[in-house]
């Protein structure tokens, strides 16, 4: 079971990684004149998103619901976050690769193709949704019902068996 102190530490780590993601999304364009620094920030951002995915799944594995074999229940409750986080990671990596390819040789020019602008808008839109759904999931996983046997869990188990 996830202890209160451990949960606070994990939640703080998740929010720190989300804050870094927000920081890079907000200020990375200011560093377009320094492509190496921008590349490092992008790599760390993608790793932070990946760490957030790993942390969420570790929190899933730690629940009583998962240990009782109700993986479908967890997936059903949190599938939006799982899918959105995966899409956001793919959009972020795609945007970072495209931006670095366009700007690496000539960082002083302002070159935005229509496709790059479209990808940029979708990545930023996904970033907002990712932050909201990820924070909601992280807080919802603190619910004690997920970590102990309860009447709610028994009802869910009976519905799954039908």
Curated annotation (Swiss-Prot):
It is a multi-pass membrane protein. The keyword Glycoprotein applies. GO terms for cellular component: cilium; vacuolar membrane. Glycans are attached at residue 6. It is found in: Vacuole membrane; Cell projection, Cilium. The chain crosses the membrane at residues 7-27, 41-61, 80-100, 115-134. Keywords: Cell projection, Cilium, Cilium biogenesis/degradation, Glycoprotein, Membrane, Transmembrane, Transmembrane helix, Vacuole. Its main location: membrane. The keyword Endoplasmic reticulum does not apply. GO terms for biological process: cilium assembly. Belongs to the TMEM138 family. Required for ciliogenesis. This is Transmembrane protein 138. It comes from Mus musculus (Mouse). The gene is Tmem138.
């Amino acid at each position: 079971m996830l202890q209160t102190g451990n949960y606070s530490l994990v939640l703080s780590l998740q929010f720190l990684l989300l804050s870094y993601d927000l920081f890079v999304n907000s200020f990375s364009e200011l560093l377009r004149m320094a492509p190496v620094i921008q590349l490092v920030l992008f790599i760390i951002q993608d790793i932070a998103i990946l760490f957030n995915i790993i942390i969420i799944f570790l929190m899933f594995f730690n629940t009583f619901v998962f240990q009782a074999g109700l993986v479908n229940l967890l997936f059903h409750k949190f599938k939006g976050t799982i899918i959105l986080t995966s899409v956001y990671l793919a959009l972020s990596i795609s945007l970072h690769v495209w931006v670095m390819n366009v700007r690496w040789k000539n960082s002083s020019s302002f070159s935005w193709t229509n496709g790059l602008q479209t990808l940029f808008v979708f990545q930023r839109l996904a970033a907002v949704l990712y932050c909201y759904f990820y924070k909601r999931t992280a807080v919802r996983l603190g619910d004690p019902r997920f970590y102990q046997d309860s009447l709610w869990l028994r009802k869910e188990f009976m519905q799954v068996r039908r």
